[in-house]
Design a protein with these regions (language model features):
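Membrane-interface segments of envelope glycosyltransferases acting on lipid-linked substrates or membrane lipids
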Residues: 1-206
């Protein structure tokens, strides 16, 4: 319930003495805009992706959440882009450059020990690949905005010349069935492995 959630958040802000409201995503940005109106606190949102593309393939969500997010982004005081390109995109759409900042996604370079070795991990996710295979991989939600279909098409082209190539796709989403069908259509369903949602990312990236 939107009104109940807003009332609860307003009470939290007043009781706990917060100084700033930070949000990201359509629903979070909408709530932050409403909270700013109710509390007068400054707001900042982190923009991770092109908000006009976030709901590709979902017309109803694009009409509702996409529109809400577009309006809310204009109401919030400050915006953080996760890359220089994202900041430039927002500036090109009329957002005030004086209220835009780039803060890059953090990377942890601490050495990590994977739970499984290469061969064991491949077996656990159903990928058929021996020591002579070169495995490319991606971990992402299977959503139209990620355009995994282009990756599969590119892989199919490369596989014709390099038959030892394999593709490991980790992630879940509404495009799963379509992407599996595409791999079959291109004749690489045995070489493309869909691992689904994974929690052991250390073994995946290793």
């Amino acid at each position: 319930n939107l009104l109940a959630a807003l009332k609860k958040l307003v009470a939290m802000v007043k009781t706990d003495g917060y100084d700033i409201i930070h949000s990201h995503g359509a629903r979070g940005n909408m709530m932050a805009a409403l909270l700013a109106h109710k509390t007068g606190l400054p707001t900042v949102t982190t923009v991770h992706s092109d908000y006009r593309l976030d709901y590709l393939g979902r017309p109803l969500s694009r009409l509702t959440y996409g529109t809400i997010n577009t309006l809310a982004l204009r109401k919030l005081k400050y915006r953080i882009g996760v890359s220089d390109a994202m900041v430039d995109l927002l500036i090109s759409r009329g957002f005030d450059p004086e209220r835009l900042f780039a803060i890059y996604n953090g990377l942890d370079f601490t050495p990590r020990t994977p739970a499984m070795g290469r061969d064991d991990y491949f077996r656990s996710v159903g990928l058929e690949a021996d020591d002579t295979c070169v495995v490319a991989g991606i971990a992402a939600r299977l959503n139209p905005v990620k355009d995994i279909a282009t990756l599969i098409r590119g892989f199919a082209l490369a596989h014709k010349d390099f038959p030892k190539l394999r593709l490991l796709i980790a992630g879940d989403g509404e495009e799963m069935d379509n992407l599996k069908a595409l791999a079959a259509e291109l004749g690489v369903s045995k070489e493309v492995c869909f691992a689904g949602w994974i929690s052991d990312t250390d073994s995946f990236y290793h």
